[in-house]
From Swiss-Prot:
Disulfide bonds: none
Enzyme Commission (EC) number: 2.7.7.-
Gene behind the chain: priS
Top-level taxonomy: Archaea, Methanobacteriati, Methanobacteriota, Methanomada group, Methanococci
An example molecular function term from Gene Ontology annotations: DNA-directed RNA polymerase activity
Active site positions, chain numbering: 105, 107, 259
UniProt-recorded name of the protein: DNA primase small subunit PriS
Enzyme class: transferase
């Protein structure tokens, strides 16, 4: 604990708010995810760090929920993998991994339209995260892998991103996917990122995606539509056109900010649905594809725990910070009365402020 009384006061208040949230989320609304086959899942958590401890397991739902209520962690995780010995320290071999959920992690960075500090969030970078989820789903998961919205679980991470779980309704397909090893998962994500794109033998899906982009950039596509050997065709073009083609290809391949480690790591932890994100205080919230597609889900509105927007504090914010809008209310370093929802964001971002009496 910090020796600074003001800092201790803030930490204690934040801890109390997290406790209030979990009391409501668990006892009243049943929001908190209970990982499937709980005894075979590893649990991790963080308070002042993203992950303070892991290698924890529980035999029953009751034990797990009692522990969450007691600890009320700022960050809460479960393993994607199912393990024989989830509480053992070590890699997949020691833990006895026998299957694994497959999930994508889209984590966007500050965009060209953002005017804030790199660590902040706004409608622009959150909008970019939404767009990337739709690209992943509509350009790849639906057409290439025959999945439907019923086969996906989409989760707002509580920050600038989303987790997209593959949960096919077909039990045989689900079983097959969850048995994928590291190599299969790596091939899967590298295909989507275009890392194994072969310009001398273009597959139909990537071909269609790129031709669509070529047309937007006024690049003649007739010969690309007829041929699979694009490398030879590109090399016949003028230098300026050739450069434009390669730049377009690179731009399309870099559209998605996918965290490859989430797909690659055998013992990866992912945020627990129904918890709060310790850096923002926003909810880790499952949403529907239709609410994302129609732009009905607004992270800076629907991601805020409503009760925390009604608890007010008088504060002195001691450093200049970018504005943030939560539930339609905008706050910045000049704000002197703020809701708990904004207080959690300030705390999570290490902003220097004090709570006044």
């Amino acid at each position: 604990m910090n020796e600074n009384p003001a800092a201790n006061k803030i930490f204690n208040e934040v801890s109390s708010l997290y406790k209030q949230y979990f009391e409501y989320a668990i006892k009243v609304r049943k929001w908190l995810e209970i990982p499937d086959d709980l005894p075979h899942r590893e649990i991790g958590y963080g308070m002042l760090k993203k992950v303070d401890n892991r290698n924890i397991s529980f035999n029953t739902e009751g034990e797990y929920l009692t522990w969450v209520l007691k600890e009320s962690p700022f960050h809460l995780y479960k393993s994607l993998s199912y393990m024989e010995y989830p509480d053992l320290v070590g890699g997949a071999a020691k833990k006895g991994l026998f299957k694994r959920e497959v999930a994508f992690d889209i984590d966007t960075h500050k965009t060209e339209k953002c005017t804030h500090d790199d660590s902040w969030i706004c409608e622009e970078c959150l909008g970019e995260a939404r767009n990337q989820v739709l690209i992943l789903i509509e350009d790849f998961l639906f057409p290439d892998f025959g999945l439907s919205e019923k086969d996906l679980k989409i989760v707002f991470t509580g920050n600038r991103g989303y987790h997209i779980y593959l949960k096919p309704e077909d039990p045989e397909l689900l079983k097959k996917i969850e048995k994928w090893g590291k190599n299969e998962r790596r091939y899967f994500i590298e295909y989507i990122l275009g890392k194994n794109l072969n310009l001398r033998n273009m597959g139909s899906r990537w071909k269609n995606i790129l031709i669509s982009e070529f047309k937007k950039n006024k690049i003649a596509t007739k010969k690309f539509e007829k041929n699979s050997d694009w490398k030879t065709e590109i090399d016949t073009r003028k230098d300026t056109t050739r450069r434009k083609i390669y730049e377009t290809i690179d731009k399309v391949k870099s559209r998605l900010e996918l965290d490859e480690k989430v797909m690659d790591d055998d013992i990866r932890l992912l945020r627990t649905i129904g918890s709060l994100h310790g850096y923002t205080g926003l909810m880790v919230k499952e949403i529907t594809y239709s609410s994302l597609k129609s732009n009905q889900f607004d992270p800076l509105n629907h991601g805020v725990f409503s009760k925390f927007h009604k608890i007010m504090y008088n504060v002195n914010i001691k450093q200049e910070i970018d504005p943030l809008t939560l539930k339609g209310d905008t706050f910045n370093h000049k704000s002197t009365e703020i809701p708990a929802s904004y207080l959690l964001f300030l705390f999570g971002h290490g902003i220097d402020f004090e709570i006044l009496e």
